[in-house]
Regions:
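Short, acidic loop-to-helix structural element flanking the phosphoryl-transfer center
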Residues: 30-31, 58-84, 124
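An amphipathic alpha-helix signature
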Residues: 1, 30-34, 92
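A metal-dependent, Asp-based hydrolase signature
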Residues: 8-10, 19-55
């Protein structure tokens, strides 16, 4: 809508500039569209900013869905007595918004964010805080995530094991896991967690 209403770029160009801004400022920054209009027009255009924000939120809401088998896996884990937590590098309100929109918030006993802790995954501190909040023993705790460095290595460095789901793990990462004999299991589908735990 921004392009259709006066942003003098085609959609691919606008998206490219926006991606650069997001890379520079981070995904939690709240004024990506403000900067986009400043960069392209030389000044902030409130109407175009509003169009960008509304379009982004409408698309996000329309596309936000749990992966297949996520709900079944959460039900299974809770039925087996597991306490579940979220460790996220997203700001707190955004993480809660995701959990509420996905209707999975009630499965989680704790939500720990980098905003609250002052450290981001893979920093050991965020895992230590999560373990402390959940009264967890690292040797009996498992991080389930999709990012090798942030989720799996961070968890292993905190003394936990990890399960990587649907991850773009490189051959180099796999070789490192084998060489270091890291307690990291790689699976393709979240539903496979039920066969491991």
């Amino acid at each position: 809508l921004m392009v259709d209403n006066g942003l003098p770029l085609d959609k691919d160009e606008a998206y490219g500039v926006l991606k650069t801004i997001i890379r520079q400022k981070g995904s939690n920054y709240g004024k990506h569209f403000n900067i986009l209009t400043e960069v392209v027009l030389g000044h902030e255009d409130p109407m175009l900013v509003a169009l960008g924000m509304i379009t982004y939120h409408n698309v996000k809401i329309a596309l936000l869905r749990p992966f297949a088998e996520t709900i079944d896996t959460l039900i299974y884990l809770k039925s087996q007595g597991y306490r579940l937590g979220v460790i996220s590098n997203v700001i707190t309100i955004k993480q809660w918004e995701k959990l509420v929109r996905l209707n999975v918030y009630s499965f989680f006993d704790e939500v720990i964010t980098s905003e609250e802790v002052g450290a981001k995954k893979p920093d050991k501190l965020i895992y230590d805080v999560a373990l402390r909040k959940m009264n967890g023993d690292p040797e009996k705790s498992i991080m389930i995530g999709n990012k090798f460095k942030e989720d799996a290595l961070g968890a292993v460095n905190a003394g936990m094991s990890a399960i990587l789901v649907n991850s773009d793990v490189t051959e180099e990462d796999r070789a490192y896991i084998r060489k270091e004999q890291l307690d990291i299991t790689i699976i393709e589908n979240i539903g496979d967690v039920n066969t491991i735990l």
